[in-house]
Design a protein with these regions (language model features):
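Primary mode marks residue(s) on the alpha4-beta5-alpha5 output face of response regulator receiver
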Residues: 30-234
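N-terminal secretory signal peptides that target proteins for export/translocation
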Residues: 1-9
Length: 234
């Protein structure tokens, strides 16, 4: 039964290409896209800082998030709201960390709570912060991609550390207009791996992979059965 549910989830995930925090191939911006350009910055910010902290923490079980560092988005980028004790970092990603060809790339409603372990905080998170800094500085999608790719090539942004992963278990997130909070899942970040080595995407496998060649990144996704508050995914 779980296998059937996971399989259905996987098909849906691939169809909507929902994955925030992973960039893909650059494509020309569709004039008919629902969000053709960046909205005013205020629409991406959360007025209540405590609400953003709570949303970020909802990405992982309380046993993890209560001692995690928490970042919130300000007008000039992410800021540390709470110092952590356990190496985890919780953050609410915005729409510009979605796939470059995602029609919701500029969706001001996008809120993706994610809680990264220490290895991911030292590697993957740096890319999210850099992308955000570039966007808030007025860069276009294409300019952001060019700058990130150059920083990776120059090793200004590090490769993924072994064991880099994150929790995305929040029922309060908003990943897309179509799917809202989608389903609870874990993600594992690897520098350009072969998905077949994980058995990703094979019939009956609960593991799925997204390859991002320009960013030299492979993200493995594993759906799970419960949200961070312990309630089942239905």
């Amino acid at each position: 039964m779980l296998g059937e549910k996971v399989g259905a989830i996987a098909v849906k995930s691939i169809a909507v290409a929902f994955m925030l925090g992973t960039a893909w191939h650059v494509m020309a911006q569709d004039a008919k896209a629902p969000y053709p350009s960046m909205a005013p910055l205020d629409q991406y910010l959360m007025e209540d800082r405590s609400s953003e902290i709570a949303l970020a923490r909802s990405a992982a079980p309380e046993s993890i998030s209560r001692d995690a560092e928490v970042l919130v988005l300000g007008r000039h980028g992410y800021e540390t709201a709470i110092q952590g004790k356990n190496g985890f970092v919780c953050i609410v990603e915005r729409s510009w960390t979605a796939p470059i060809d995602d029609p919701g790339f500029w969706n001001p409603k996008g809120r993706a709570p994610i809680c990264l372990n220490a290895a991911a905080a030292r590697s993957y998170l740096l890319r999210t912060i850099k992308k955000t800094d570039l966007i808030l500085a007025g860069r276009t999608k294409a300019q952001m991609v060019e700058a990130i790719a150059a920083a990776i090539d120059k090793k200004e942004l590090p490769a993924m550390e072994p064991g880099a992963m994150c929790y995305m278990l929040s029922k309060q997130g908003y990943l897309s207009d179509r799917d809202g909070h989608w389903h609870p899942h874990l993600m594992f970040f690897v520098s350009q791996a072969d998905p077949a080595a994980w058995g990703a995407g094979l019939p009956g496998s609960p593991v799925f992979a997204f390859n991002d060649t320009w960013e030299h990144l492979t993200t493995f996704l594993v759906p799970v059965r419960v949200w961070s508050d312990g309630t089942p995914d239905r």
